[in-house]
Amino acid sequence: LAEHDRATLERWRTQFVRTKIAPLITPAAQALVEQHRARGDTLLIITATNSFITAPIAEAFGIPHLIATEPEELNGQFTGKVAGVPSYREGKVERLSEWLTDRHENLDDSWFYSDSLNDLPLLSRVSQPFAVNADAVLAAHARHMGWPVLQIG
């Protein structure tokens, strides 16, 4: 991100979301989000991917909350560094804990869907962990733990 001006990055991001991400947003994924919305659940995406890339994805799903790795900015330009704690592995748990504390909420009746073995620290803390479109290693671990394994095509 640091090598290009903001206008170029935003243009590329728009094209990326339109051509690569939008086709991956399946009716099944949208229906799952809508089920949680209808239940009155707090909707949150938590991802290791940076917020510059993931904010439009959260917006496309109508998910109002996003915890993502934050790219450092200086005078409107990305520096190539990370600001704060990256939301990766245990950092994801740390960032979520801070977010929950700030909102006076907790993980009671929480649901978390992941396709990554890197999310085991968070999967093991929520009430309802789900492995989604998981690779063989995560799927095997999820089955061993008794967690549901979903394929959302």
What spans do the regions from the language model cover?
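Helix-loop "lid/cap" segments that line or gate small-molecule binding pockets
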Residues: 1
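C-terminal cap/substrate-recognition subdomain and adjoining C-terminal extension
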Residues: 6-153
